[in-house]
């Protein structure tokens, strides 16, 4: 049985969906004002694996990952670039989808945009006002009255008393309590705005996810996920809004992925250690990035360095090399009673334990290398596929390259043929020179009875 760590209860729990055989899951997606960075890759890949495992476990999964397409950062960046917010949003969504494809992400069931749900946001805010949980201010904003929601702080542990005692909160004369947060922002000149009972304006960030999740999954659903930085205030405020509006539990299980640090420090532009997915893709294959993320447990912090990415590349190369040269039988699906598959399943059923599952893949690859058994190789490929790995032909991965200055496959084959000709002519010096040239270019040759095969180092 699947168990998962629930941030809400701070413990592992057996997973019991609201509706047997079906899972409803919402994950906070991108605010589309800039390219996705490696931290976003962690979240995207982590919840993609969770989605895949739920599907592999036989569940019918309704997976919703939103797009925040109206927000202060979007307006500011569009102004800086001299384009409209709409132009920036469309450009950034296209970039995001290219990055998602490079990481091998499955598309979510639904990918709603905030601007398509403003009417629902207005309706929820009206309900919150009617329930005494929110109030319009004189400046045209609408605020959530946090003191009116008894359970505030239950997700993050940051209760109102702790917040007032431990954090400096800027006083705003429009708020009844400095900790109240905005649900609706009054329109400012030149900014996108919508009509509402409180005048023209736009929704606050937190209300967007409450409305989009409930629209697609209902007022009470199974799983809500996101990065651990969203626990507070975003997810805490989502709970206050949704439960304040509907009067019952919003989400049963809250999942949060850990951060990616760069050389042991938090990634930030000011430290000069900020990497977009595009930056990393210039040097590493997208599947290598995915493997780097997947081989660590989703809740653990992960350190990013070039040497660690190179180690991930070598690890994935080992797995693909085990499949090389074996004609695989057609897959009949995974037999979960097989010893390796059963261990893989036990790891994944324990809070999506990908690090242990990857260890099983390496053990299985070692067995395949020894036996060259097509059935074991098929199992290796199928189990890897559950994690979104090993989905390509081994030759495509092993001989594919990224980065400038690398030899093309055609150039490598031509040099291998020249080396073969030199060996046939017993010109050993030329043969060695060509091998050394290929080695210097990162090409590994393996001579065997069937000829020479190659891969990139």
Swiss-Prot record:
Gene Ontology molecular function: any one: zinc ion binding
Reactions that this protein is recorded to catalyse: tRNA(Cys) + L-cysteine + ATP = L-cysteinyl-tRNA(Cys) + AMP + diphosphate
Keywords attached to this entry: Aminoacyl-tRNA synthetase, ATP-binding, Cytoplasm, Ligase, Metal-binding, Nucleotide-binding, Protein biosynthesis, Zinc
Requisite cofactors: Zn(2+)
GO cellular-component term (any): cytosol
Localization per record: Cytoplasm
Protein name: Cysteine--tRNA ligase
Organism: Chromobacterium violaceum (strain ATCC 12472 / DSM 30191 / JCM 1249 / CCUG 213 / NBRC 12614 / NCIMB 9131 / NCTC 9757 / MK)
